[in-house]
Amino acid sequence: MARYLGPKLKLSRREGTDLFLKSGVRAIDTKCKIEQAPGQHGARKPRLSDYGVQLREKQKVRRIYGVLERQFRNYYKEAARLKGNTGENLLALLEGRLDNVVYRMGFGATRAEARQLVSHKAIMVNGRVVNIASYQISPNDVVSIREKAKKQSRVKAALELAEQREKPTWLEVDAGKMEGTYKRKPERSDLSADINEHLIVELYSK
């Protein structure tokens, strides 16, 4: 499945929640009718079956993290192999992606922008350039902006935006040095309560 390149607000309206695809810190529901489906007047939402609800939740999480269908299924398979709660393992794997960590540290205004920084070789992990967005970050890894990329206006703008967001407790960021440490994997209580990972587990368990 190809990556969606259309209007970001349209995706959030389709899912009925803010997917944090735009760079602003103001909630999207203050910018558009988030509860109204895309279309001139908003299509009436049909009553979903249990399968439909599960599928919609999977699509929502997949879009939040910008992961393609095959990648997402592979993350689920890996999460199921790990010890512990499969749903929580899945979220931890998604949060551990390099592009997501770059976003969480405030170096990219959105996950899409963070992914672009990674692919353009502007990001280093433990002093080495890594240009794979799905690269898994481990506890105590140091993620930093490459020296020649530190002057980019988009990085500076992203750091200013990040000052207005709640800082993740599992990360330690030095905005001046443009580097941060992935102290630990996030716990479920650290992440959005708007995600129901149990629905995704139910979907893939069938």
Swiss-Prot record:
Keywords: Ribonucleoprotein, Ribosomal protein, RNA-binding, rRNA-binding. CDD domains: S4. Residues 96-156 form the S4 RNA-binding domain. Disulfide bonds: none annotated. Pfam families: Ribosomal_S4 (PF00163), S4 (PF01479). Signal peptide: none annotated. SMART domains: Ribosomal_S4, S4. GO terms for biological process: ribosomal small subunit biogenesis; translation. One of its GO terms (cellular component) is small ribosomal subunit. Gene3D superfamilies: Ribosomal Protein S4 Delta 41, Chain A, domain 1 (1.10.1050.10), RNA-binding S4 domain (3.10.290.10). One of its GO terms (molecular function) is rRNA binding. It comes from the Bacteria. One of the primary rRNA binding proteins, it binds directly to 16S rRNA where it nucleates assembly of the body of the 30S subunit. PANTHER family: 30S 40S RIBOSOMAL PROTEIN, SMALL RIBOSOMAL SUBUNIT PROTEIN US4M. Part of the 30S ribosomal subunit. Contacts protein S5. The interaction surface between S4 and S5 is involved in control of translational fidelity. HAMAP family: Ribosomal_uS4_B. NCBIfam families: PRK05327.1, rpsD_bact. Belongs to the universal ribosomal protein uS4 family. This is Small ribosomal subunit protein uS4. It comes from Salmonella paratyphi A (strain AKU_12601). The gene is rpsD.
